Amino acid sequence: DLVRSRGLGDVYKRQVHGMAQRGGSVSTQVRWGDKVYGPVFGKGEADIMVALEKMEAVRYAEFLNPDGVAVINDYAIKSTTIASGAEEYPEGCIEAMQKNFKTIAVSASDIAIQLGNPKCMNVVLFGAMCDSLGCPEIDWEQIVAETVPAKVKELNLKAFRAGREAAKASK
């Protein structure tokens, strides 16, 4: 609705929750362009990936096109099997992504905690991602200000700016 309301084209999304309630993966596909007919894209077709956890970036890397950008939260969530010791968390997730894609790795969870609310981690990642969208004419900060509740507006603006700065430092 936000994209359409600003005359920026069509946008469609699809979410797959799978075993999310049991610590499993969640994926969302978003397609945005002048004319979009549906939300689904295939392997190697995504221009940008935003991963809220670094192992998830590797898990879904096959959807990113070779010139795509991976924006990754440098954070590990230990699944039940890893927490129990049955498996080990894989090392080198971000490095593996850097070998194949332009990668922006930021400690979004840590930044959100430093700002006082871990729930704003997604806004930190949004800030880290926005310059990769190739839309300099869009005032993303204004969009954040207009779309979040007034009581958390300043927090979200700080999170957005911190994400943008972290992305610049990551390059």
Q: Residue locations for each model-derived region?
A:
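N-terminal beta-loop-helix "entrance" segment that forms/cooperates
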Residues: K13-F41
